[in-house]
């Protein structure tokens, strides 16, 4: 009997369970906090540009090409901290599924009184039978190309997209995903509010 193999397997399972419990507790706190979250005018354009700048070194280190087309002065009524988390989860989901030398494209635009953000990544398409479940809690397609590290500050055992939907729903928005020819596109929409400075 190769005891080292079994010890390693047990350690991996215990580590996975520990992270799942931590993620569940984290989500429970998030759900409670969102019920009384403070709302204000959020410049979504600046928020996304900030997050892209924050993760620029990580994308460069992994030789991932990042294309961005961010329309200026896209405002929504919401909680910036939670909206940042939703966008962050989309970006990290794309990062984890994109191989070196491939591309991630982020767009933000105003569309029919909505703000629409899209995050596309080159890579494996999601199987059709999995598509309807990716928003479920603790569901994962098991197609990730990279482990999650402290560098990106995200634990992902299958709650990332579930949290995105929860946050977007709280902001009276919508979100979804679709397979493209060479990858996957995730999107979210929020009601637009006018730039009061104009």
Q: Where would I find each of the regions flagged by the language model?
A:
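Short alpha-helical segment of the dimerization/phosphotransfer core of two-component systems
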Residues: 12-17
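Conserved catalytic submotifs in the C-terminal HATPase_c
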Residues: 38-41, 60, 65-75
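Short helix-loop "hinge" at the ATP-lid/N-box region of the Bergerat-fold HATPase_c
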Residues: 94-95
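Short beta-strand/loop element within the Bergerat-fold HATPase_c
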Residues: 101-113
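Short conserved segment of the HATPase_c
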Residues: 126-139, 146-149
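Short alpha-helical Gxxx[C/S/T] motif in the catalytic ATP-binding
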Residues: 160, 164
């Amino acid at each position: 009997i190769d005891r080292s193999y079994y010890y390693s397997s047990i350690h991996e399972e215990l580590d996975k369970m520990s992270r799942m419990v931590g993620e569940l507790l984290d989500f429970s706190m998030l759900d409670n906090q969102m019920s009384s979250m403070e709302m204000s005018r959020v410049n979504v354009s600046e928020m996304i540009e900030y997050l892209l700048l924050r993760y620029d070194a990580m994308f460069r280190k992994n030789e991932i090409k990042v294309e961005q087309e961010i329309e200026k002065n896209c405002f929504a009524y919401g909680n910036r901290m939670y909206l940042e988390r939703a966008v962050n989860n989309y970006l990290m989901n794309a990062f984890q599924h994109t191989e070196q030398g491939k591309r991630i494209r982020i767009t933000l635009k105003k569309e029919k009184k909505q703000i629409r953000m899209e995050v596309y990544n080159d890579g494996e398409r999601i199987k059709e039978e999995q598509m309807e479940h990716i928003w479920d809690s603790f569901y994962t397609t098991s197609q990730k190309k990279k482990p999650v590290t402290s560098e990106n500050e995200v634990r992902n055992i299958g709650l990332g997209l579930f949290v995105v939907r929860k946050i977007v729903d709280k902001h009276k928005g919508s979100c979804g995903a679709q397979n493209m020819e060479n990858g996957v596109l995730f999107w979210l929409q929020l009601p637009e509010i006018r730039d009061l400075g104009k």
